[in-house]
Amino acid sequence: MAKLSKRMRVIREKVDGTKEYSINEAIALLKELATAKFVESVDVAVNLGIDARKSDQNVRGATVLPHGTGRDVRVAVFTQGANAEAAKAAGAELVGMDDLADLVKKGEMNFDVVIASPDAMRVVGQLGQILGPRGLMPNPKVGTVTPNVAEAVKNAKAGQVRYRNDKNGIIHTTLGKVSFDEVQLKENLESLLVALKKAKPSSAKGIFIKKVSISTTMGAGVAVDQASLEAQG
């Protein structure tokens, strides 16, 4: 059996895997154990009461976290005309049509989010095999195919997170950085859970949000007692 690192031993001693912690305790624990030499992200895993094998129970969408994600997001927009000027004014780093598609085909993808106006999808559609595997393909369900590209750019810059359940019915996304204060992380989590509850499929029965766990980039997951969120919020 591989020998545990000192860091992992400390984490195992501090985190009780059988316990659900109040949100305040969970965040304090993450901060205490975040000893990496870089500012770690705080991520969340939400187990949903869905059957992920059924397409009508899959959950996908996007929401803007009230305190952002702590990341500088570079945005590329496929559009033209007045929309192109609006996208640039909103802060998009790259704006274009065929010229932007050529950059993507060359592998020059110095961006984190791709947005497209509906009329640009004839160009973007040719890039599916490149953008799709990277999770960058624009989609109307998450607001990245839209006639209002300026608003989409502003949302991306403001800290919008996209979510989609995996094959096990779990949502994985980010809540911010471990340098955020307790209130910021708590409010970001509550905002995400509100968005998920609104996205509950009508065919999903029983308890929808079954388990919530938060973790840092290099840390273990800490289960959160949902009652502590409701009691404090």
Swiss-Prot record:
Entry annotated with the keyword Ribonucleoprotein: yes
Coiled coil: none
Subunit structure: Part of the 50S ribosomal subunit.
Lineage: Bacteria, Pseudomonadati, Pseudomonadota, Gammaproteobacteria, Aeromonadales
Any single Gene Ontology cellular-component annotation: cytosolic large ribosomal subunit
UniProt GO molecular function: rRNA binding; structural constituent of ribosome; tRNA binding
Protein name: Large ribosomal subunit protein uL1
Key words of the record: Repressor, Ribonucleoprotein, Ribosomal protein, RNA-binding, rRNA-binding, Translation regulation, tRNA-binding
InterPro entries: Ribosom_uL1_bac-type, Ribosomal_uL1, Ribosomal_uL1-like, Ribosomal_uL1/biogenesis, Ribosomal_uL1_3-a/b-sand, Ribosomal_uL1_CS
Organism this protein belongs to: Aeromonas salmonicida (strain A449)
Functional summary from the UniProt entry: Binds directly to 23S rRNA. The L1 stalk is quite mobile in the ribosome, and is involved in E site tRNA release. Protein L1 is also a translational repressor protein, it controls the translation of the L11 operon by binding to its mRNA.
BP-aspect Gene Ontology terms: regulation of translation; translation
Recorded family membership: Belongs to the universal ribosomal protein uL1 family.
UniProt entry tagged with the keyword Hydrolase: no
